[in-house]
Curated annotation (Swiss-Prot):
InterPro entries: Ribosomal_uS2, Ribosomal_uS2_bac/mit/plastid, Ribosomal_uS2_CS, Ribosomal_uS2_flav_dom_sf
The protein's name in its UniProt record: Small ribosomal subunit protein uS2
Keyword Ribosomal protein attached: yes
Gene Ontology biological-process entries: translation
Protein family: Belongs to the universal ribosomal protein uS2 family.
Amino acid sequence: MSVVTMKQLLEAGVHFGHQTRRWNPKMATYIYMERNGIYIIDLQQTVKKFDAAYEFVKSVAAAGKGVLFVGTKKQAQETIREEASRCGMYFVNQRWLGGMLTNYKTIKRRVLRLKELEKQEAEGAFEVLSKKEVARLLNERERLERFLGGIKEMDKLPGAVFVVDPRKERIAVAEARKLNIPVVAIVDTNCDPDEIDYVIPGNDDAIRAVKLISSRIADAVLEGKQGEQITT
């Protein structure tokens, strides 16, 4: 049985692509028809591709590797945080900082700084400082938390990256490709599918569509983790 049904995809609006003037010809194979100036995505292909992506993500989690969820557009931010947190994985939902993967050692130092500030605050170290200094440190901590909070527990590079809108997240996709980290993505009609290892053709703008797909990817992680526990 498929991970997601045609009915669920239709109800979430996964089939609505972009306007016909905003498209990538490489997506032609995933387009069912054109209606009122909008491309309609072939959901039969989405179901098949989704099953393959699900199995892959499950295998990554079963191997004890991490999955990094990436979605910085407004429609994806909350869902990406919720679903990554639900399955115990990492996320970037504000801004992709260049080098998050390719310059991970430097990013890791910033994460350690964030943890250090949290520890100092918890232990009461801020109490002996001036109000001005405390305000500066709190501001630094909040900024680090905003951009790096989702990868705070990521102590090594992930085994896969899940992306909402690879066109917007092109830097994240490029970094993953450079490091040979497989990319799973919701790919709308204006995106280039050639850059993605596991294409999920679908609407990357509707909140319900993003929620449905992201939640199933999180389910794949949880199922894979169960498999890891059984085999270890």
